Amino acid sequence: MTREELIAWATRNGWKLDRWGHLKKEFDNGTHRLKLSRIAARHEISTPFGWARLASGYLKNLSINADGKLAGMNR
């Protein structure tokens, strides 16, 4: 999966790009972020102390499964 494919999937599912090029979305348990780098993505949640990593994975290992969900991230 490429960075552009990940951004396209995320924006179709309600994620919004912030000014730093990361994707954010509000959930019942708080703000989540997909922090994108050149080769990897991290799924993080906002805490009172900053961002905490929930899962991460290299873009080459990420894919969209049959249910339309992101697969390939490790905890």
Feature-to-residue mapping (PLM):
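Generic detector of ordered, mature protein regions
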Residues: G14, R19, L36, A71-G72
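Negatively charged, low-complexity tracts enriched in Asp/Glu with abundant Ser/Thr
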Residues: M1-K24
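Compositionally biased non-globular segments, especially hydrophobic aliphatic-rich helices
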Residues: T11-N13, A55-Y58, K69
